[in-house]
Amino acid sequence: MKSSHRFPLRRQIVWGMRFFTILTSLAVGAALFILSNQYVRANSLQAAEFNLRLVATSIETSLDSADALLNWASINSTVRRYISQEDVNGTQTIAAYEAVQEKYYSSTLYSHILRFFITNENDRHLQFGTLNSSAALNRTTIKQFLTKGYGMQFTTDPLLPGSPDCIALSQPVRSGKGTLHRGSTYLALDTAIITDPAAGYSLTDGSALYWEMGSRLWQIQNGSLTETENRLREVDYTLRTESKSGVTEQTAWQSKVQLDGQNYYVVKVTLNGRSAALVQLLPANTF
């Protein structure tokens, strides 16, 4: 005789099917939840990358205009004649001054130029910008602008203590055949060329936007740049999109990092041809 405490076979089958259905539903729900989180995370990181590209493109446009201005100053025959010839008369001096003046005022960067000069690094200088009324340029003061060589750097004006930070670009002026060093051309731009394009940038709670240049890092916040310890220097990034030759497309990177016990996703977009990048941190717990 069968035990009265044992479920009939049919009841066992029903309960088994119910239990299986519950387990299946839980598994499907968990899988959908994971897939949903992955989808949201992927979309959020892609959106951050897209937004960084927009800001980076605007900054690149300004820096390309700066390069164009410096290139013009270094090869313009009227300016180079004034810089390089031993004997220059008044007419040549005025012609060089007016040529640079016209280029300065017509530049798309005009409102951002703090200091712009071309010099033979001795006794001839053509200078424009809002800081040109500071200490005079001469053989000694010129050297203070070029202590780190040519290129792009984040600095302050050496002749005006307490002046705001600026992005400085410089390059040499050479002879017509490009062999002899004739002088230097220097351009200092206010940091609004970075902060203006980033104005209104959408950040979620806990996110942060940064400007990285060389090994240094600045947070972009409330229209200003604040230097901070670069704890992202050793981040192991994964390449997302590589810059294409001849096409304005910045190289994009992604990674994950732990800072102060909290996990973050990192999206980085490097500017074409420059040791600079825009970086966004996104808290991992928001996905």
Predicted regions mapped to residue ranges:
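Solvent-exposed, extracytoplasmic
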Residues: 97-110, 177-180, 184-226
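Juxtamembrane/transmembrane-helix boundary motifs in multi-pass membrane proteins
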Residues: 4-12, 37, 41, 97-98, ...
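Extracytoplasmic/periplasmic ligand-binding sensor regions of membrane-associated signaling proteins
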Residues: 109-112, 118-191, 196
